[in-house]
Amino acid sequence: MYSFNSRIRYSEVDKNAELTIEALINYFQDCTIFQTEDGPANMAYLNDLGAAWVLNSWQIDILRHPKLNEEVVIGTVPYMIKGPMGFRNFFMDTAGGERLAVANSIWTLFDFNKGVPIKATDRMIEAYPVEDKLEMDYGSRKIAIPEDGTRYEAEEIVVRNYHLDTNNHVNNGQYIRMALDSLKAQNVKVSHLRAEYKKQALLGDIIHPVVIENNLGDNNIYTVSLNNDEGETVCVIQLTV
């Protein structure tokens, strides 16, 4: 396990002074980058190989949204590396040990020079010692787009520089912000999130969000398909509020 301590900042909260979902994802992404940079297979090593870990899917369960100034612990637990695939959990706890959020993620090691997945090297395996997976209700990596429900198209989004990460692709967390901004209902409090990443979006690409809303008991479930100009799904996100 790898972890670091932090405190919820004003720049990370919404109008209710609670941590936003994209800020939570940023914490998780920072945690895995910190572990990578502190180990023998850092980003410079990956760059020399022309490789990067590409996120396939998220599942995030939020038990409570922490508030401004709360002290928190963010951690990650790699639990399996198999061929080109990496599997890791994340968590956010309070300083007192209350679990605030738990997540599962699946990654592929991709060689951008050859355009193919590649097997993790011994150095990478050393960098990410595996442990037992965390307790959570593990769902499918695949997200089916519902045929029923209330469907509408949201305003198109042009990919800007601020959407990009160091791989010159849209950052994983930015897709979540796009999905949230596409909802007619604003300032929703997300309790569960799933995301399946299918393609990479680049600078200047146009994203066409399609939202399908369904009800399940007391919850609203929003499935957001972020499509490219060809109508292909770049990323599909499911939000339970």
How would you name each of these model-derived features?
Residues 2-4, 61, 67-142, 201-203, ...:
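HotDog/MaoC-like acyl-thioester-processing domains
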Residues 1-55, 102-104, 111-187:
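Hot-dog-fold acyl-thioester-processing enzymes
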